[in-house]
Amino acid sequence: MNEAIFVPQSIFKVAGKGLVVSGSLKSGVLRPGMMAEIKKQKINILGIEAFNKKIEEVKGTDSAAKLLGIILPESAEKVLIASVNQEIIFKESK
């Protein structure tokens, strides 16, 4: 099972997109549809962008992994604020 470790740094609400979390990917491969559980709330990645372009996957070794924005549901805002600068492990959904 693929796992990716993402460290969120900033959280923004973007009209027409939802919640955009910028940060860096420390390891693994991150794809839309992957899921994390933070404080018993499941969070699903809706999309990934880097350098203003949608991307289907990013690896921890890619240059885009350092300036990454992941799009998440707005319902995740409260748990993400508490998780800024902490590692979040995303896994492939089953």
Labelled PLM ranges:
Residues G33:
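Residue-level signal for inorganic ion chemistry
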Residues L19-V21:
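Structural beta-strand segments of beta-rich domains
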Residues N2-A15, S24-K26, E37-K94:
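Beta-strand/loop-dominated core regions that host nucleotide or nucleotide-derived cofactor-binding catalytic loops
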